[in-house]
Amino acid sequence: MSEERRKMLADYGAELVLTPAAEGMGGAVAAAKRIVKERGGFFADQFGNPSSVKAHFETTAPEIFSALPSVKAIVAGVGSGGTAIGIKKYIVAHGLDCKVFALEPAESPLMSEGRAGAHLIQGIGANFIPALVDTKAFDGILTVRGEDAVREVGALFRTYGIECGISSAAAVLGARALRKDTDGDILAILPDRADRYPSSLYH
């Protein structure tokens, strides 16, 4: 977790409980469950809460197809999986001609190759397949190297004035990789901003 994310949470009054980076998001989930058991509380279950899929089915997907009905391919990074699965369910439910491609770090290609590893793309690649995710639902799984995504953050800002985060830049790279094989518009989901990651980007 970047220093900026930690500060933002602390500013909101949150008590930060940090887990070893080597444990990945699985370690954070286990710690959250332990806190609920020992101290009481509510476990939102980001990786297994069907409300995430429902939200993207009811809001994100309709917005996409209202604004860009010509879209033929959508690239979404998979953290909890709610975005990609929610959009795909909407496409199927409405019989739309559009493919959904999941994106994961090349250093941790768990969905595509079955192996997990450390990587630089915060927000995706939890090093376990979330309960919300059915990998067979996707039309393809793309991978992007962390170093390439970090570089792309700067390139997007300098070229287009887009100040996005690392997973957003990775989605753009994934979308570019589809250009030769896609006849129509390609949309990349950009879910985060660069101001959450300066310490991770400029070291």
Can you say where each PLM-predicted feature lies in the sequence?
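A glycine-rich helix N-cap at a beta->alpha junction
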Residues: 1-35
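Short, conserved catalytic or adaptor-binding loops enriched in Gly and charged residues
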Residues: 8, 33-37, 129-136
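A structural micro-motif
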Residues: 14, 39-41, 98, 184
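Short beta-strands and strand-loop turn motifs
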Residues: 16-18, 43-47
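Glycine-rich phosphate/pyrophosphate-binding loop at beta-loop-alpha junctions
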Residues: 26, 48-143, 148-149, 177-203
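Short glycine/threonine-rich catalytic loop with a Thr-x-Gly-x-Asp
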Residues: 44, 160-169
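A short glycine/serine-rich beta->alpha loop
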Residues: 72-73, 157-163
